Amino acid sequence: NYVKAAGGDGITVMYALRPLVKHNTADSVACEMNDRIYSEPGNRLGKVAAAIWPWKCKDALFRYNEVTDTRLNQDGMAYDADSGDGTVYEYNYSRMNGCGCVMFCLEEAIHNTFRHNVSYDDLGGTISPASNPDARLEQNIFYVRDGVPFVRNHMDGGNYTESNDRIIPIEK
C-alpha cells in the first residue's frame, strides 16, 4: 500500500489480535492537522495524527514499512505504539517526520519493542516515551540532526531501555 497526503493518520489498525502490517509506505500524511481545519478542538485536543500505528491492539507486528514527511502536529511521528500490549516495530525506515520517529503513548501502551529500524533525520525529537512504563529499543540506527533532541521535549516522562542502538549525528 502507498498512502500519500492523507489528511490525518496514514494506516491505523484498531482493536485487533496479532495484526500484521507490512510493506507499506506513508508519505506526507497528517497534512490537514492544522488550525484551519481544526479551529476549535476544545477538550478533545484534536490535532493528533501519526503515520502507521495500532490502537488498542494485542501483539501487533509492523515490519518493512517506510514513512517520510509526516506533518508537524501534536503527534506527528512515523510510528506510535498506542494503548496496546506487545506492539513490535521491526525493519522499518523513517525519514524527516515532523515530530520524530516513534512514540510509546502513555501508560496503557505496555510491552512494546522497537528493533532493527532505521531513522534518518526525523525532526522534533527522535523518540517520545510519553509516560510509557516499559518501552524497549533494540539494535536500531538513529541518524540525528545537530540540535534535534534524541528524546522529544515535553514527551520525555516515560521509561525505556536501549540495547545496542547506534545514534549517529548528522550535520545540516
Annotate the PLM regions.
Residues 149:
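Aromatic/acidic polysaccharide-binding cleft in carbohydrate-active enzymes
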Residues 102-105:
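Extracellular glycoside hydrolase catalytic/binding regions
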Residues 1-9, 17-42, 48-71, 78, ...:
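Right-handed parallel beta-helix
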Residues 125, 152:
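Active-site rim elements
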